[in-house]
């Protein structure tokens, strides 16, 4: 998922010590209904403001341990250059609706081939994204059958199987159709 786009930084901003800057855009919302991709993509820009070619380690974290991340483990950024990367976040099916955050981190581990991890700090950017609400029910209905006369009680049985990631309600109604009425006026699903 590494997409590279490189460009120079102005020479007035170039520094001597190895460092990296990271900025990320908030990703789009995540749909979690059965069959959905359940993913969103974070677009980040890494900037190397130093005079060194740097190896930068990328990290991901969230308070939600169920989230899965896919990101490049490390990238190399030339002196005074920028690079764009993508981080994919995957959420479990029917995960609770709401707004969540994730952190994308970057740490310079090498400068010009020399290990500098002990003297560099981890930089991070936090993003927020929304897990969308979902609710759906399958309904199975039946009735005892036979001929029903005027005034006879009618018993219907209904079975509801619902899946949701947030509180929701759904309504159903029964429509009685006169005998001999055209079936084309019946509600969808009745014959």
Where are these regions (language model features)?
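Bacterial N-terminal signal peptides
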Residues: 1-5
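Long beta-sheet-rich domains in secretory-pathway and surface-associated proteins
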Residues: 9-191
């Amino acid at each position: 998922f590494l997409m590279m786009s490189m460009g120079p930084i102005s020479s007035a901003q170039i520094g001597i010590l190895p460092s990296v800057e990271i900025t990320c855009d908030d990703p789009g919302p995540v749909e979690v209904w059965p069959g959905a991709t359940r993913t969103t993509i974070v677009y980040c820009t890494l900037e190397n403001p130093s005079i060194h070619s740097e190896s930068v380690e990328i990290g991901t974290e969230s308070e939600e341990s169920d989230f899965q991340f896919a990101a490049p483990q490390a990238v190399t950024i030339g002196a005074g250059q920028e690079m764009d990367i993508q981080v994919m976040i995957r959420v479990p099916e029917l995960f609770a609706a709401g707004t969540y955050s994730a952190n994308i981190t970057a740490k310079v581990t090498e400068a010009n081939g020399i290990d500098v991890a002990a003297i560099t700090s981890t930089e991070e950017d936090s993003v927020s994204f929304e897990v969308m609400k979902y609710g759906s029910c399958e309904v199975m209905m039946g009735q005892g059958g036979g001929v029903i006369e005027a005034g006879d009680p009618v018993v219907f049985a209904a079975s509801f199987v619902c899946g949701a990631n947030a509180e929701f309600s759904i309504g159903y109604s029964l429509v009685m159709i006169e005998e001999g009425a055209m079936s084309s006026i019946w509600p969808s699903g009745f014959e």
